[in-house]
Amino acid sequence: MRLPSPLVVALAALTLGGVPSAAAQTMEPMSYSNAPIGLNFLIAGYSHQWGNVLADPSLPVRDVEASVDAGNLAYSRIIDVWGQSGSLAMVVPYAWLSASGEVFEQARSTSRTGLADTSMRLSVNLYGAPALSLQEFAKYQQDTIVGVSLFVTAPTGQYDPNRLINIGTNRWSLKPELGVSKALGAWTLEAAAGVTFYTDNDAFAGNGVRRQDPLYSVQAHAIYNLNPTLWAALDGTYYTGGRTTVNGVIGDDLQRNSRWGGTLAYSIDRLNSLKLYYSSGLAARTGTDFQIVGLAWQHRWGLGL
């Protein structure tokens, strides 16, 4: 049985994260869609990021140019939540980072390799996406879906307090999000708004304490189903807030940044899908003006597929 196009790689955007700045700015088309209860997904992804990836005005580092290659492994399962569909997902990324810039006006370069922070997500569709069996799902037609998600990022990534640049963040983050998806013939329009809260990093650049205000974000997607096995999306996001305080000193790093990108997803067969994505900075007040390109493979199983 070949599943409808909206399900193709709908969860692969989970593998976008590789470094903190990128993880905070990911764009995820098809995040709020329906799928049969009991399906499992294994996702393997690779991404390459380059540019001002590691911008952090609270560090004595300027003119940073970096490249990050990240491999990601994710698992997700579709679940029944009080008669509505939902999903549980977990992503473990591994990153290879190289960077150059000026530290206290001296040219420096460095490289890092190791685990990045692990992410988890719970999503629940509140309206328009009932819990369905595989047979029931074959007759399902999307109209309007309203859902919520909770993203949690754990400080499992490589972190050395004596280094200015790290792969991990040494803090937790929590992001609740509200999303809406509307099907209009071959088109699907999707929008989501969320806010990310951060715990303190109490081992910042030695024994310093770094705090960060909440980061508010909105994203929108225009998705077009080219045929039953292929869809494409135009993606955009805007985020603001996130000002930092280091050892009581408030930073001049309020974010008002935007990004745009595109996504192409293809269903190879009833069990395997591929997704290609790209995004770039559109306007950046405090740096983080980088580009990212990635490829994700998704395998699904369960329900006798």
Each model region followed by its residue ranges:
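Outer-membrane beta-barrel biogenesis signature
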Residues: 20-43, 128-144, 302-305
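Residues that define the transmembrane beta-barrel architecture of outer-membrane proteins
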Residues: 38, 65-72, 113-120, 144, ...
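Transmembrane beta-strands of outer-membrane beta-barrel proteins
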Residues: 40-42, 86-90, 120, 144-150, ...
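Residues on the lipid-exposed face of transmembrane beta-strands in outer-membrane beta-barrel proteins
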Residues: 44-46, 73-77, 120-126, 150, ...
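Transmembrane beta-strands of outer-membrane beta-barrel pores
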Residues: 46-52, 92-98, 126, 152-158, ...
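Surface-exposed strand-loop-strand hairpins of Gram-negative outer-membrane beta-barrel proteins
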Residues: 49-70, 107-108, 161-165
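Repeated loop/turn-to-beta-strand initiation elements of outer-membrane beta-barrel proteins
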Residues: 52-53, 83-86, 130, 186-189, ...
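Outer membrane beta-barrel transmembrane domains
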Residues: 205-305
